[in-house]
């Protein structure tokens, strides 16, 4: 079997990693081994962060809806149950936007939910 010289591929890989490590402090931006470790960690954290962002936004929307429903005299869980029973198909993002930007319309949604719960 023929000998494989990796000079071109290795240099290409090093260049790619060092380009990703641009802006890192000290040896982490200059030395391949430390840069590679930092880049791998950064990419892993970015991957995890993209998933955490979804959770964080959902938590934020729920907190906003909960605050707005309690102002109107209803708990979050009862409100969600009421709008599901009423057949209102709105996601939490839309509901939180309405709660912030149009409180009057949101209070009407709360009233609809209350009627469905009591019916």
UniProtKB/Swiss-Prot annotation:
Summary of the function given for this chain in its UniProt record: Binds directly to 23S ribosomal RNA and is necessary for the in vitro assembly process of the 50S ribosomal subunit. It is not involved in the protein synthesizing functions of that subunit.
Annotated family: Belongs to the bacterial ribosomal protein bL20 family.
Taxonomy of the source species: Bacteria, Bacillati, Bacillota, Clostridia, Eubacteriales
Keywords noted in UniProt: Ribonucleoprotein, Ribosomal protein, RNA-binding, rRNA-binding
Source organism: Clostridium acetobutylicum (strain ATCC 824 / DSM 792 / JCM 1419 / IAM 19013 / LMG 5710 / NBRC 13948 / NRRL B-527 / VKM B-1787 / 2291 / W)
Protein name: Large ribosomal subunit protein bL20
Pfam families (UniProt xref): Ribosomal_L20
PANTHER family: 39S RIBOSOMAL PROTEIN L20
Domain of life: Bacteria
């Amino acid at each position: 079997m023929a000998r494989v010289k990796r000079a071109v591929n290795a240099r290409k890989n090093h260049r790619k990693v060092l380009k990703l490590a641009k802006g890192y402090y000290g040896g982490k931006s200059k030395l391949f081994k430390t840069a590679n470790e930092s880049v791998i960690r950064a990419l892993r954290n970015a991957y995890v962060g993209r998933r955490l962002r979804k959770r964080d936004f959902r938590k934020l929307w729920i907190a906003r809806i909960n605050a707005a429903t309690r102002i109107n005299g209803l708990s979050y869980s009862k409100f969600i149950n009421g709008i599901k029973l009423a057949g209102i198909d709105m996601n939490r993002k839309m509901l939180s936007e309405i709660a912030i930007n149009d409180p009057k319309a949101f209070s009407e949604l709360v009233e609809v939910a209350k009627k469905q719960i009591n019916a």
